Amino acid sequence: MNEFQPVNRRQFLFTLGATAASAILLKGCGNPPSSSGGGTSSTTQPTAAGASDLEVKTIKLGYIPIFEAAPLIIGREKGFFAKYGLDVEVSKQASWAAARDNVILGSAGGGIDGGQWQMPMPALLTEGAISNGQKVPMYVLACLSTQGNGIAVSNQLKAQNLGLKLAPNRDFILNYPQTSGRKFKASYTFPNANQDFWIRYWFAAGGIDPDKDIELLTVPSAETLQNMRNGTIDCFSTGDPWPSRIAKDDVGYQAALTGQMWPYHPEEFLALRADWVDKHPKATLALLMGLMEAQQWCDQKANRAEMAKILSGRNFFNVPVSILQPILEGQIKVGADGKDLNNFDAGPLFWKSPRGSVSYPYKGLTLWFLVESIRWGFNKQVLPDIAAAQKLNDRVTREDLWQEAAKKLGVPAADIPTGSTRGTETFFDGITYNPDSPQAYLQSLKIKRA
């Protein structure tokens, strides 16, 4: 299965609509009105000053039905984007390859203007590395969420009780060809990006070379359940609700959460075509302000039940509330024994975490995805070394636009980062990443291609 193959846009692109409903006076984290009923209607916010001055009133954003998309969907359904004068169309994408192909087209060509992205897809699109050489300059504007991802393992391997630390299972996985007639098979949803990196890091930390000791496959999120059920894959890395759906359907179990691997790590990001942003600076700020309010709303515990109901709608995730709500409330089962973490902060967070801002696009964090690309020898033509990665990252990640939108929105100064890093990041295996010394991080890794 190759996600780099071109896709038929008409076959995969679905347009989601929403109509205005009851008006409420709400600032991001207030008490919610009645649910929109699973994505069939929209709540109108009071219109903000300046909303009529935008260069454009519409934008089309793509998303994949996993929790990282929640702020985009909630921003649309709860009227936060409309409050700032924008009619945001959120368009479900069949795969990351479909999203890539559609942003190349742009909305004027029947595609999308941007949306939710695994990293470093925006940087790679900017350089034409994943678009057959066609450069599509992109800007990264905000981080959509932290955590909310996991690594699920087939129930056929329940006796092995694979967990966060794989060292005890190393011999079992290395000897898999002798015991099972093939290499251990693991999957992710798109190559050379977030979920590929998470599963590679997990294996490598356990002394298992993901390029030599196992077989890695690309499988879209929605197909992971069936592929694990029929034995095509032994484990996979993707965003919830799919790992939890595997456990709920008793097909597999969650061996590890990415939030355990790297607490409060950056997950997926909002990125737009640079030409759209450059042409519509006011609309870009309006989009960011609406997103920020949506992220604040998403982070309120009192709103998680309604959030689950909205996301469960057929137009969006098409997954039962009974699966979505526990994850959003931090009731996540991990391990072969299905132990419940019961920790709200272990689930997806959208606005703030114990490490500070979730939404802010720290350049030091977006850089990690490019450094990890260098680690595995990906896209050497555009990422030959750390200096090239830093230069590309500085061009693509727009901290300045986030800061401007936050100030305009009235976000407290204490919640607006002024630096480009959170300091040193520590992984579960003791490895540290200092964004100011990325080469030292690379040198500290035992299994790598760099």
UniProtKB/Swiss-Prot annotation:
The keyword Ion transport applies. One of its GO terms (cellular component) is plasma membrane. Residues 1-36 form the signal peptide. Disulfide bonds: none annotated. Induction: By carbon dioxide-limited conditions, probably via CmpR. Predicted to be exported by the Tat system. The position of the signal peptide cleavage has not been experimentally proven. It is found in: Cell inner membrane. It is a peripheral membrane protein. Keywords: Cell inner membrane, Cell membrane, Ion transport, Membrane, Signal, Transport. GO terms for biological process: monoatomic ion transport. Part of the ABC transporter complex CmpABCD involved in bicarbonate transport. Binds bicarbonate with high affinity. PANTHER family: ALIPHATIC SULFONATES-BINDING PROTEIN-RELATED (PTHR30024), NITRATE_NITRITE BINDING PROTEIN NRTA (PTHR30024:SF7). The complex is composed of two ATP-binding proteins (CmpC and CmpD), a transmembrane protein (CmpB) and a solute-binding protein (CmpA). This is Bicarbonate-binding protein CmpA. It comes from Synechococcus sp. (strain ATCC 27144 / PCC 6301 / SAUG 1402/1).
